[in-house]
């Protein structure tokens, strides 16, 4: 994540890379995906929930910081605040991972991402939206 944010790419490319990194990680680690969505191990639920929350908070913070930096240097004001943009990105990621787990790992979280990205990008960056 830090490598993505440190790159000289546009915020659009960074956001796409961030989303694809997380989706690919969950795709390659289905057991972790299941755990992060609340399927606890026996006796682990009380300890697991705060750790999962902390992990998602860290992902959101990294995304939000990158979006804030990008907006501070952007010429056009995006249609959403960095907080709203981050919420949208995380909801899309969590939704794709939920679908993956619910399908018993048959429907990849990266399936159709390349086709969906242009629409996501417009929603995140289109100043005329």
Model regions and ranges:
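Hydrophobic recognition helices of helix-based DNA-binding modules
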Residues: 1, 26, 63, 67, ...
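Hydrophobic/aromatic-rich alpha-helical bundle segments in the mid-to-C-terminal region
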Residues: 33-37, 49, 71-119, 127-129
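Short helix-capping/turn signature of helix-turn-helix
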Residues: 37-44
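Amphipathic alpha-helical packing segments from all-alpha helical-bundle domains
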Residues: 28, 46-73, 83-87
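Non-membrane alpha-helical structural segments and their capping/turn regions in soluble enzymes
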Residues: 12, 16, 53, 57-60, ...
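Hydrophobic alpha-helical connector segments
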Residues: 1-31, 82-89
């Amino acid at each position: 994540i830090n490598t993505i944010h440190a790159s000289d790419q546009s915020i659009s490319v960074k956001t796409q890379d961030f989303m694809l990194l997380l989706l690919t990680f969950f795709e390659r680690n289905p057991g972790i995906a299941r755990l992060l969505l609340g399927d606890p191990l026996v006796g682990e639920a009380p300890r697991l929930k705060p750790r999962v929350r902390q992990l998602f908070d860290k992902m959101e913070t990294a995304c939000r910081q990158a979006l804030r930096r990008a907006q501070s240097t952007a010429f056009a004001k995006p249609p959403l605040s960095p907080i709203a943009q981050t919420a949208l990105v995380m909801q899309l990621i969590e939704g794709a991972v939920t679908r993956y787990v619910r399908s018993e790992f048959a429907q990849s979280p990266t399936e159709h991402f390349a086709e969906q990205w242009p629409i996501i990008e417009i929603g995140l960056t289109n100043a005329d939206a």
